Amino acid sequence: MEVNILAFIATALFILIPTAFLLIIYVKTASQND
């Protein structure tokens, strides 16, 4: 099977961007609680 690079990148971005966004919010919240 041929791997669709663009589809792979799009999927990776679709997963990583929201994850990074949530991590940033979590870190900011954790810092404020300190």
Swiss-Prot record:
Protein species of origin: Agrostis stolonifera (Creeping bentgrass)
Family, similarity comment: Belongs to the PsbM family.
Transmembrane segments: 5-25
Lineage, top ranks: Eukaryota, Viridiplantae, Streptophyta, Embryophyta, Tracheophyta
Subcellular location: Plastid, Chloroplast thylakoid membrane
Protein's UniProt keywords contain Transmembrane: yes
GO CC annotation: chloroplast thylakoid membrane; photosystem II
Domain of life according to the entry: Eukaryota
Coiled-coil region(s): none
Complexes and interactors: PSII is composed of 1 copy each of membrane proteins PsbA, PsbB, PsbC, PsbD, PsbE, PsbF, PsbH, PsbI, PsbJ, PsbK, PsbL, PsbM, PsbT, PsbX, PsbY, PsbZ, Psb30/Ycf12, at least 3 peripheral proteins of the oxygen-evolving complex and a large number of cofactors. It forms dimeric complexes.
Function in brief: One of the components of the core complex of photosystem II (PSII). PSII is a light-driven water:plastoquinone oxidoreductase that uses light energy to abstract electrons from H(2)O, generating O(2) and a proton gradient subsequently used for ATP formation. It consists of a core antenna complex that captures photons, and an electron transfer chain that converts photonic excitation into a charge separation. This subunit is found at the monomer-monomer interface.
Membrane topology of this protein: Single-pass membrane protein
The protein, known as: Photosystem II reaction center protein M
InterPro entries found in the cross-reference section: PSII_PsbM, PSII_PsbM_sf
Keywords: Chloroplast, Membrane, Photosynthesis, Photosystem II, Plastid, Reaction center, Thylakoid, Transmembrane, Transmembrane helix
Main localization of the protein described in the UniProt heading: plastid
UniProt-listed GO biological process terms: photosynthesis, light reaction
